[in-house]
Amino acid sequence: MKDFFRVIYENSGDGSLNKDKLYKTPSEYTHLYNDIVCRSYKNNVYFNVRMSYPMCCYVNNTKQHLEENANILEVKLDEQEFGRLLAVGYPDSYQKNSLNKAIFSSVNYDIAKNGDFYVTYEADTLIYQYDCDYEQKKCFGYAGKDMDLNYRYIKTPKESGKYWRNERQTKGYYNWLEYVDETGLLFRSYQKGGTRPVDGLQFYKDGVLIGDVNVPKGLKVCGYVSPYYYSYVMPNEEREIMYLYRFKL
């Protein structure tokens, strides 16, 4: 397995491929290490990714990037090779004020036991549902409440690096999806941003919003053990405390 994962980083090195080919070549992508998402279905694993070359990044090549960048990479464990590039392109909401969304251009997703993908983009209100062949079945979703969407306009990769952390910490965006097979509920977490003392959590059933509630900052649903839903562990480094929440619906 160690040798296999080393293959992921063996790209062309000098960017000798043209941009069209780069976007279609799995080995030219890199993980989003600060906010990595890894899911599995059968004997495949899926990572959120972005194009690795500066000349093809969101800011430097915006128009083509919005059309051709893949956001999810499939890896076939049995064959020890790359699979499909998925979530190619961006929703219509990214076409307007595109550079304001440069720092919020990743996806969150989950995969149900039947192989359906649920995908949400960080700065887009909708959730997209696909079958296991990645054919779209439906889209649904509502904007979160009281989100600070006053994103900074980013003109260069240098500016992106300079403002990345502050924007991610202080602005509102959709930051997690969790589908619970046992109950058929889909949870979408979102950061409200600004000085809001809480974050938000939406839950959907068959594409219908049935709740949008305030939750402790950083809460993301991890799973379900009847009769409770559980959050991921949330550390408080200053107080040296670790929180885990559970709740019923």
Regions found by a protein language model. Name each.
Residues 1-249:
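Eukaryotic scaffold repeat domains enriched in small/polar residues
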